[in-house]
């Protein structure tokens, strides 16, 4: 399958469509998750798509396919059962998390192309620092030399996406040893910094957002303010 070219994959009438960008900073996981659910539940055909960028407090999240046996020793880090696809992963400081809240049918996108586009955005971002990112068949996400650098877990409800991608930038990777990441025993993880890339979250966020905008032909419009309760 060829890389997703948003200007070809997205419906022609929606190329260059506006999307709001919310830079949420450091946030606990659960309030952001609940806000994504509310946003998705109340949006209609006129709602503007949004991308939320966040750095979560330490948390393990267990997706719908997740098994508690893959959580080995969480210690002081909470475990939250969530409604995304996939297994268990870790979120924490130094990890860039992006939640695209998109109306996929309006963009002319199927789930497969959507997932492929997110992965391609990460791969293209890594390439800016001469890091070779790769896909793995039947295991969504992006890998470098067999180690996972970006985890992908999504949910699509009534054609609208929420949850998203978690990209390891410059973080303490020790908590990944307390789980079987994404349900795979012994799966190694890595980060942009460990591979010689930048440690600055703002630098990596700017690069990834530009690639996501390119993949899905967005024009991103930053907006201020937190989310309604």
From Swiss-Prot:
Chief place where the protein resides: cytoplasm
A GO MF term: lipoyl(octanoyl) transferase activity
SUPFAM superfamilies, sorted: Class II aaRS and biotin synthetases
Transferase listed as a keyword: yes
Keyword Chloroplast listed: no
Residue sites binding substrate per the record: 84-91, 151-153, 164-166
Active site: 182
Locations listed in the record: Cytoplasm
Reactions listed under catalytic activity: octanoyl-[ACP] + L-lysyl-[protein] = N(6)-octanoyl-L-lysyl-[protein] + holo-[ACP] + H(+)
Enzymatic class: transferase
Site (Lowers pKa of active site Cys): 148
Record-listed E.C. numbers: 2.3.1.181
Assigned keywords, A-Z: Acyltransferase, Cytoplasm, Transferase
Cellular component, GO annotation: cytoplasm
GO BP annotation list: protein modification process
Domain BPL/LPL catalytic: 45-220
PANTHER family in the cross-refs: LIPOYLTRANSFERASE 2, MITOCHONDRIAL-RELATED (PTHR10993:SF7), OCTANOYLTRANSFERASE (PTHR10993)
Its biological purpose: Catalyzes the transfer of endogenously produced octanoic acid from octanoyl-acyl-carrier-protein onto the lipoyl domains of lipoate-dependent enzymes. Lipoyl-ACP can also act as a substrate although octanoyl-ACP is likely to be the physiological substrate.
Family: Belongs to the LipB family.
NCBIfam families named in the record: lipB, PRK14342.1
Name of the protein in question: Octanoyltransferase
């Amino acid at each position: 399958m060829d890389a997703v070219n948003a200007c070809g994959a997205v419906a022609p009438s929606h190329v260059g469509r506006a999307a709001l960008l919310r830079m949420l900073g450091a946030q606990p996981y659960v309030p952001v998750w609940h806000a994504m659910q509310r946003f998705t539940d109340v949006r209609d055909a006129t709602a503007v798509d949004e991308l939320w960028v966040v750095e979560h407090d330490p948390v393990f999240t267990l997706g719908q396919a997740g098994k508690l046996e893959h959580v080995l020793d969480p210690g002081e880090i909470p475990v939250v059962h969530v409604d995304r696809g996939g297994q268990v992963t870790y979120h924490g400081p130094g990890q860039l998390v992006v939640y695209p809240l998109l109306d996929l049918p309006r963009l002319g996108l199927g789930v497969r192309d959507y997932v492929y586009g997110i992965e391609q955005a990460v791969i293209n971002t890594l390439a800016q620092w001469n890091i070779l990112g790769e896909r793995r068949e039947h295991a969504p996400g992006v890998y470098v030399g067999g180690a996972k650098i970006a985890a992908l877990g999504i949910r699509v409800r009534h054609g609208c996406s929420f949850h998203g991608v978690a990209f390891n930038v410059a973080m303490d990777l020790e908590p990944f040893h307390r789980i079987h990441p994404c349900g795979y025993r012994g799966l190694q993880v890595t980060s942009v910094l460990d591979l010689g890339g930048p440690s600055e979250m703002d630098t990596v966020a700017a690069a990834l957002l530009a690639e996501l905008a390119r993949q899905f032909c967005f024009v991103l419009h930053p907006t201020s303010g937190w989310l309604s309760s």
